[in-house]
Design a protein with these regions (language model features):
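Extracytoplasmic/secreted envelope proteins and their assembly/folding machinery
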Residues: 25, 29, 83, 87, ...
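A short, solvent-exposed beta-edge/loop patch
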Residues: 102-139
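Ampiphathic alpha-helical segments that act as solvent-exposed interaction surfaces
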Residues: 92-96, 127-150
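Sec/Tat signal peptide C-region and signal peptidase I cleavage site
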Residues: 15-21
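Short, internal acidic amphipathic alpha-helical interface segments
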Residues: 72-112, 116
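Ser/Thr-rich, low-complexity intrinsically disordered terminal regions
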Residues: 30, 34-81
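Sec-dependent N-terminal signal peptides
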Residues: 4-15
Length: 150
């Protein structure tokens, strides 16, 4: 009986986490459409949308054994700049910044940078608030990063 009860609890937890993830994904998609963006899904079911001609991704991940989802809203770029310079710019941009973060990475031969905001959410109100906040902050952070590249 204990095994049966434990199995039911595990199944319920997994199903509720999947519903939470799906709900957050639907909330973000609906919010973006309502704000006038044209969101689509990529091959991983991440949400892709454009802001001022720049591709943004909303990546939703379930948090095991919890009733919330982790969301990363980001824009990725390839830069014809030395990796060390990208890393220095990222570190400089991240000083005294707590919400939007910049990172540098190597992708094979390419040097790349990413500007992202992360949050956790478990309801539509919080999801919409955080997405609006991301859409306010990220374009400015991206612009500042690009200015440093010149």
């Amino acid at each position: 009986m204990k095994k049966f009860t434990l199995t039911l609890l595990l199944i319920f937890g997994t199903v509720s986490a999947l519903f939470a993830q799906q709900s957050v994904r639907e909330d973000i998609f609906a919010f973006l459409k309502c704000e006038g963006y044209v969101p689509t899904f990529d091959e991983d079911r991440d949400i892709l949308f454009k802001v001022q001609g720049i591709n943004y991704y909303a990546i939703i991940k379930e948090v095991a054994d919890m009733d919330y989802a982790y969301v990363e809203v980001s824009a990725n770029f390839t830069a014809d700049v030395l990796y060390d310079k990208l890393l220095a710019i990222s570190n400089d941009q991240n000083r005294d910044k707590f919400v939007c973060k910049c990172s540098a990475e190597r992708d094979g031969e390419d040097n790349c940078f990413k500007v992202a905001m992360e949050f956790i959410t478990n309801n539509r109100t919080n999801t919409e608030y955080q997405m609006a906040h991301a859409l306010r902050l990220l374009p400015g952070r991206i612009e500042k990063f690009k200015e440093e590249l010149d």
